[in-house]
């Protein structure tokens, strides 16, 4: 299950962070064979290679590095990395997949050192490095966590003492940017300190890691409690924990908050790790976790205030998981914007409400709540696909600015800096 992998990763990541080295901890150890067989295998051994394979009618079964893998012959032909099939400069496929015979079968298969060679009926030769096959096989991928994370409640996060990054260091050095992104990827939140309290400097900060995602709220948003938009956020009322833009088909990936001024009391920001809460549900009621990951719901935003007229609808389950490794990658939770439940059969509705209540109970546990007082100069970045946010009610005049960032661009920046994202 995905949480077992995450717990294992978290333990290794914490140990590595204590030693100042995180990159080496992202590789999983070899795992036991997923299949057993009594068939006759081709067997090749050397000082460095122990590899066996068997040719079936429509696929190759390969055992290497403690892994038993199965590869469809069409897949093996389609993924050929020869110069005529794959452009190594653009990293794009040149082969027309539709031209591959769906009944194709290699004439010969042989191993040379760590390379496995396939000769096809037309004489074309495909070769694969054994480690590449392990890395890209389904059996290999299902054992890997796509994005290593450290799940947290309030106590765990405070004990971690995750440092903020200085504004100038963030803007001017790759070291500062990498440190910030590493914290953000692991915890789903990160802070930048000593930012001049202006909308312009907040925008400059955001553009350092991503394109700003323009939405119905504009490019940069600036709001007070004047109810200038048809949203509870534009009031002084408390906001329960939620993720934003659940009414978009693809919710915004990252949001940025900067409190420019507050002349009053209250208004603390609430942060809850939705993945930590989901893990608790999976451990206590796995059938409810599964239901929340399969039942699609509509979320809706209807606005008719002044010149703003919008009707947005987004559809998806509360919990979104990768089907091959069951890893959670997105939580869509907003009781304010959830539309009429009309996508769920009668006999599932009550079970869904029960599962929703279980998740809500975990999200509302006081020990899972991290309260932060935002102030001028301190900018908060939130992974909107993971961490829920809210606020307590407040008095006085309060100005906030911020924006949404495109998730793909943030992850792109992280990968270019050598981070696992």
UniProtKB/Swiss-Prot annotation:
<comment type="pathway">
    <text>Amine and polyamine biosynthesis; carnitine biosynthesis.</text>
</comment>
<comment type="function">
    <text>Converts trimethyllysine (TML) into hydroxytrimethyllysine (HTML).</text>
</comment>
<dbReference type="InterPro" id="IPR038492">
    <property type="entry name" value="GBBH-like_N_sf"/>
</dbReference>
<keyword id="KW-0223">Dioxygenase</keyword>
<keyword id="KW-0809">Transit peptide</keyword>
<dbReference type="Pfam" id="PF02668">
    <property type="entry name" value="TauD"/>
</dbReference>
<dbReference type="GO" id="GO:0005759">
    <property type="term" value="C:mitochondrial matrix"/>
</dbReference>
<feature type="modified residue" description="N6-acetyllysine">
    <location>
        <position position="179"/>
    </location>
</feature>
<keyword id="KW-0007">Acetylation</keyword>
<dbReference type="GO" id="GO:0045329">
    <property type="term" value="P:carnitine biosynthetic process"/>
</dbReference>
<comment type="similarity">
    <text>Belongs to the gamma-BBH/TMLD family.</text>
</comment>
<dbReference type="GO" id="GO:0050353">
    <property type="term" value="F:trimethyllysine dioxygenase activity"/>
</dbReference>
<dbReference type="GO" id="GO:0016702">
    <property type="term" value="F:oxidoreductase activity, acting on single donors with incorporation of molecular oxygen, incorporation of two atoms of oxygen"/>
</dbReference>
<protein>
    <recommendedName>
        <fullName>Trimethyllysine dioxygenase, mitochondrial</fullName>
        <ecNumber>1.14.11.8</ecNumber>
    </recommendedName>
</protein>
<keyword id="KW-0479">Metal-binding</keyword>
<feature type="binding site">
    <location>
        <position position="244"/>
    </location>
    <ligand>
        <name>Fe cation</name>
    </ligand>
</feature>
<dbReference type="GO" id="GO:0005739">
    <property type="term" value="C:mitochondrion"/>
</dbReference>
<comment type="subunit">
    <text>Homodimer.</text>
</comment>
<keyword id="KW-0560">Oxidoreductase</keyword>
<feature type="binding site">
    <location>
        <position position="389"/>
    </location>
    <ligand>
        <name>Fe cation</name>
    </ligand>
</feature>
<keyword id="KW-0124">Carnitine biosynthesis</keyword>
<dbReference type="InterPro" id="IPR042098">
    <property type="entry name" value="TauD-like_sf"/>
</dbReference>
<dbReference type="InterPro" id="IPR003819">
    <property type="entry name" value="TauD/TfdA-like"/>
</dbReference>
<feature type="modified residue" description="N6-acetyllysine">
    <location>
        <position position="236"/>
    </location>
</feature>
<dbReference type="InterPro" id="IPR050411">
    <property type="entry name" value="AlphaKG_dependent_hydroxylases"/>
</dbReference>
<dbReference type="InterPro" id="IPR010376">
    <property type="entry name" value="GBBH-like_N"/>
</dbReference>
<keyword id="KW-0408">Iron</keyword>
<dbReference type="InterPro" id="IPR012776">
    <property type="entry name" value="Trimethyllysine_dOase"/>
</dbReference>
<feature type="transit peptide" description="Mitochondrion">
    <location>
        <begin position="1"/>
        <end position="15"/>
    </location>
</feature>
<dbReference type="Pfam" id="PF06155">
    <property type="entry name" value="GBBH-like_N"/>
</dbReference>
<feature type="binding site">
    <location>
        <position position="242"/>
    </location>
    <ligand>
        <name>Fe cation</name>
    </ligand>
</feature>
<keyword id="KW-0496">Mitochondrion</keyword>
<dbReference type="GO" id="GO:0005506">
    <property type="term" value="F:iron ion binding"/>
</dbReference>
